[in-house]
Structures are given as C-alpha cells and as structure tokens.
C-alpha cells in the first residue's frame, strides 16, 4: 500500500516558505522541488496561486544523472559498489523505476488535463542552454515580474556565458544495468510530448 504524505509535506513547505518570506521581507519565494512533479494536481490544489517552472531534459541525461548522484552518496557512506551483485541490481532497478515514475506521472497528469497549465511553464534544457535570454524574458512575463535594466543586463551577460558551456558529465549506462534503447522506449511519451520542438 502506498502512503500519500503530500498534505503533511505541503503543510511543512507552507510553513517554511512563510518564514522565509517574513524574514526576507520579499514578495515571492522560489523553491527548487524535485518531487512535486509526481503529484502536481495536489500541489496546485494546496498552492492555487503558485506558479511552476517545470524543467524538461532528455531522459538519457536526467536518469543517469539521478542514478549517479544517489549511488555516489550511497557509495561514500555504505560502499554501494562493493555490495553483493544481486543487491546492487535490485536497488538500481528500483531507483531507475522511481526516477522514471517522476517523469511519467507529470506527463500523465499533463496530457489528461489534470494540471492547471496556465500556472505551469515548461522549460526545456536545450532552450535554457541555447536561447537563455529569450527564455528568461518569457519566464519573467509568466511570473509577472517587471524586467528592470539591471535584470536585463544580467540575463544578457549570462546568455553569452551559457553559449560556451559544455557539460563534462559522461555516464556509463552499462554500469547501471541500462541501455539507451531501454530508456528511450520507457520514456517515449516524454520525448513525443515535451521534446519534439513544441516548447
């Protein structure tokens, strides 16, 4: 049986964000959440005025990155890669399925109109890297934040640096018991809906 702890989690987030806003005397708070995407309808119901920037990146980059991050922490603490082979394989499969589930749940809610799309902006990683300035101006408009000269200058400077950025991360899918074909097949709906050029 799956436990739904979203109400408890949203209560906690609400308290934390309220404290941060009070202390900073700011009007808005920007949170970076990894798990809200798996339960976006409930999140929007609890925070009806909230706006969401949902980052979409190629699952061939996202999933190995998540696997590498989690197993790296586990290896430092528990020597993950020295554990018995069957234990590692079982854990990696479960972790892969969980990371995949985060993507698929949001996609299912999106295509089934369970998400208030007017409150969500889809941001693709490719646009973030290749068209940073225009994307940022769109985001400011979406968030109803006034574009000051200072913000515009900062965005244009960052856009120039962004063009030269190259990620040094290389992931060995075989290490995680995966293949490129498997990820593409499992996440084919993510590609067709969000990564086909419409966003």
Question: For the regions a protein language model found, what residue spans apply to each?
Answer:
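Short catalytic/ligand-binding loop motif for oxyanion handling, primarily in non-cytosolic enzymes
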Residues: 38-39, 61-65, 129-132
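Flexible, glycine/threonine-enriched loop-and-boundary segments that flank and lead into catalytic domains
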Residues: 20-49
């Amino acid at each position: 049986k799956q436990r739904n702890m979203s109400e408890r989690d949203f209560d906690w987030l609400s308290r934390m964000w309220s404290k941060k806003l009070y202390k900073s005397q700011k009007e808005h708070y920007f949170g970076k959440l990894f798990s809200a995407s798996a339960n976006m309808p409930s999140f929007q119901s609890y925070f009806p005025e909230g706006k969401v920037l949902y980052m979409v990146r190629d699952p061939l980059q996202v999933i190995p990155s998540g696997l590498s991050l989690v197993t790296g922490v586990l290896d430092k603490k528990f020597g993950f890669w020295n554990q018995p082979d069957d234990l590692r394989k079982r854990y990696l499969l479960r972790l892969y399925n969980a990371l995949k589930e985060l993507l698929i749940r949001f996609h299912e809610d999106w295509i089934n109109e369970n998400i208030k799309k007017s409150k969500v902006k889809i941001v693709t990683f490719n646009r973030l890297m290749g068209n940073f300035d225009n994307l940022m101006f769109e985001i400011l408009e979406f968030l109803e934040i006034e574009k000051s000269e200072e913000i515009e200058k900062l965005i244009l400077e960052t856009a120039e640096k962004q063009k030269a950025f190259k990620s040094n991360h290389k992931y060995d899918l075989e290490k995680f018991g995966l293949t490129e074909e498997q990820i593409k097949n499992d996440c084919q709906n993510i590609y067709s809906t969000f990564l086909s050029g419409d966003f």
